[in-house]
């Protein structure tokens, strides 16, 4: 996204409200939902999202490394979401949430340049013993995806081979 687009959006968004107002939490917490076709801000090629969860012990240095890598790649994210997950273990066989910090970032898709960035971010996540959110992933390595799903083999016992998806084809690749 061009810097002037981000500046214009931020200026318009923050000027729209005058004074204090009471409002429902939904539009406050999901501001992009109020903008029709917001995904077009990323251009014709769209965007990819990278979301990871980092264990508490490695979260801070890994976050610094992720942000440093993004800066060195001269990239930025129009939308960033940082949350701390609680201490409950994953409940489902393919659950993403687990104790730690999660960071979600949107990047305009720029072909090989974006693929290299995601590969570099994934290396940091793997080194930190983190995980990738498969439901939001389009570019991560199959091995890291498998590591992100520690109960995948248990889930496979219930899988119907007649059903398939891009995620499953990627997970089965290079096995």
Predicted features along the sequence, with ranges:
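Noncatalytic alpha-helical scaffold of FAD-dependent oxidoreductases
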Residues: 1-175
